[in-house]
């Protein structure tokens, strides 16, 4: 793939010169940059991009929308937007939720200001690749002082019957003192068995006083090798409450970061992960405290089945000058097989004295006494294990503030466990 092909893609979509130029600069950097470091995860031989920038044809794998409620929603299959719904009262308040290139026409100044502002195009090889080759995406913009009570849904299907890379950029801009709940799904759809790649970046910009509840359920298929980056950038007194279910079937490296720029900003990152078969999932979860009295909490629990591998890296970094900051983390992994592999690595980097910080990490097998108790009550081994897993992950799931997300995450866990 050449720079000329990327330039032609930009021209075909009438992208502004600043974006076209950024793609070109990113392309030039790809070869010289290193892969991001995910501690104790070896993924340098994974195929995380084949250097193409193409679009999907209209797909047969389109779900039925006839029973949907009237709330803010966007659905894409591959690179195509197949459903878009914005209630009139929200449109009148200036709310925008549309595909990336349509948003470039509707709110160009905002996208130029915030696109790739929480992650830089030259941070590493995968960031540069993403900037050069992302082929679709979505933008959600909530103006200042707007509160949306119903959950907002963004559903993004990877079409397994298509060979088009799943390279998406999702940009969420929550204006000052706005308040939203957003649910995102990344899911494979179709019967195709061809190998596929995904490079997904989600940016959440929470401006001063904004309150964002962000939930995601990732269910990419076993033939998809993926890099998923979710980044939050928080202003003064802003908050992001993350709840992420990592339930993919293929190999995944993920980077979930919150930069607490503003004084009094607050981020909670709750992650539930389930690895099975022979898959490898490596997850970096990071909070960086820049602002005074900022608070960052990480709570992540994972379960490993069969011969799978799961790595949690929890990273809390308090920057010099962030007086009164607090960084806490807990990472725990439960293994249901003696052939499973796991790491849970707590990392604290503290450059300021007047702060609080703490961490906890554990890896273990199912408690035989728990299994004995459940099986003595007439449960078979598989059912008993499912109950133990639900209890182990439930301590994280119960902290998720949106009931619909809790219920869907539990159903997803049950579905994955039932495939054993």
Where do the language-model regions lie?
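Conserved beta-strand/loop scaffold segments within soluble protein domains that form the structured core
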Residues: 96-379, 393, 397-420
């Amino acid at each position: 793939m050449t720079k000329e092909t990327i330039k032609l893609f930009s021209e075909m979509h009438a992208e502004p010169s600043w974006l076209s130029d950024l793609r070109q600069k990113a392309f030039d950097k790809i070869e010289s940059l290193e892969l991001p470091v995910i501690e104790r995860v070896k993924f340098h031989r994974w195929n995380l991009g084949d250097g193409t920038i193409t679009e999907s044809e209209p797909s047969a794998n389109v779900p039925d929308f006839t029973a949907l409620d009237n709330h803010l929603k966007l659905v894409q299959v591959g690179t195509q937007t197949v459903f878009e719904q914005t209630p009139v009262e929200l449109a009148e308040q200036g709310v925008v939720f549309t595909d990336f290139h349509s948003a470039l026409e509707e709110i160009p100044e905002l996208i130029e200001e915030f696109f790739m502002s929480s992650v830089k195009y030259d941070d590493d090889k995968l960031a540069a690749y993403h900037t050069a080759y992302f082929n679709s995406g979505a933008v959600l913009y909530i103006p200042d002082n707007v509160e949306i009570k119903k959950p907002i849904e963004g559903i993004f299907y990877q079409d397994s019957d298509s060979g088009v890379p799943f390279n998406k950029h999702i940009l969420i801009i929550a204006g000052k003192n706005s308040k939203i709940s957003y649910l995102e799904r990344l899911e494979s759809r179709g019967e195709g068995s061809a190998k596929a790649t995904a490079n997904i970046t989600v940016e959440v910009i929470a401006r001063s006083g904004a309150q964002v509840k962000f939930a995601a359920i990732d269910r990419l298929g076993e033939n998809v090798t993926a890099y998923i980056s979710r980044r939050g950038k928080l202003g003064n007194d802003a908050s992001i409450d993350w709840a992420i279910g990592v339930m993919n079937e293929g190999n995944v490296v993920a980077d979930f970061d919150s930069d607490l720029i503003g004084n009094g900003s607050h981020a909670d990152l709750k992650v539930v992960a389930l690895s099975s078969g022979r898959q490898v999932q490596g997850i970096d979860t990071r909070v960086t405290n820049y602002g005074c009295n900022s608070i960052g909490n990480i709570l992540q629990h994972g379960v490993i089945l069969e011969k799978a591998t799961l790595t949690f890296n929890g990273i809390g970094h308090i920057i010099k000058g962030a007086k009164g900051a607090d960084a806490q983390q807990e990472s725990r992994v439960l293994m249901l097989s003696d052939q499973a592999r796991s790491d849970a690595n707590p990392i604290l980097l503290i450059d300021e004295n007047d702060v609080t910080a703490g961490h906890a990490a554990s890896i273990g097998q199912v408690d035989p006494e728990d299994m004995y108790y459940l099986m003595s009550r007439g449960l078979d081994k598989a059912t008993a294990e499912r109950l133990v897993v639900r209890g182990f992950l439930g301590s994280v799931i119960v902290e998720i503030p949106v009931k619909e997300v809790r219920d869907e995450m539990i159903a997803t866990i049950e579905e994955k466990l039932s495939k054993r």
